[in-house]
Amino acid sequence: MRKHLSWWWLATVCMLLFSHLSAVQTRGIKHRIKWNRKALPSTAQITEAQVAENRPGAFIKQGRKLDIDFGAEGNRYYEANYWQFPDGIHYNGCSEANVTKEAFVTGCINATQAANQGEFQKPDNKLHQQVLWRLVQELCSLKHCEFWLERGAGLRVTMHQPVLLCLLALIWLTVK
């Protein structure tokens, strides 16, 4: 009986070691006061423009010139006007576990088109529209999901795998 109880204690210790107890934050005055830190904006201070900046498909314009081939005429136009074009896109379509690259790029392009309809419907400059479309396609195809890199590279280690491994070892030792 004593040997059987020692295995349960071992299982309890393993469960505590690999559980989420390390993620629990301690509460105290020291953790509440953050010296020399800027206060986070309250909900009243967050403007509609700030919310719109982070919507899916929103352009990121920082004035960087990207190395993308638009063809001879498109390259000249982009050289002269690169500061008017986006150099990034806010889009995170990686929430689905099995999303393919093609579905991800299509979703990114559709979200970008929906979020920036005014940019895409300027009828005055056809070359600007062509360069913008090519740029959006490139920016969306350059984005990636982390799990694409991990496919084929073995198992992803999650928090539950060490616990399952410990339980498997416990069952094996108990049966032995």
From Swiss-Prot:
Provide the protein's localization. Answer: Cell membrane
Signal peptide range equals: 1-25
From the UniProt entry, list the residue stretches annotated as the region Cu(2+) binding: 122-139
Q: Name one GO molecular function term.
A: copper ion binding
Q: Where is the lipid attached (GPI-anchor amidated glycine)?
A: G152
Q: Which residues are glycosylated?
A: T43, N98, N110
Gene3D superfamilies linked:
Prion/Doppel protein, beta-ribbon domain
Tissue pattern of expression reads:
Expressed in testis, in Sertoli cells, ejaculated spermatozoa and in seminal fluid (at protein level).
Annotated function: Required for normal acrosome reaction and for normal male fertility. Can bind Cu(2+).
What protein is this chain from? Prion-like protein doppel
**Taxonomic lineage from the root:** Eukaryota, Metazoa, Chordata, Craniata, Vertebrata
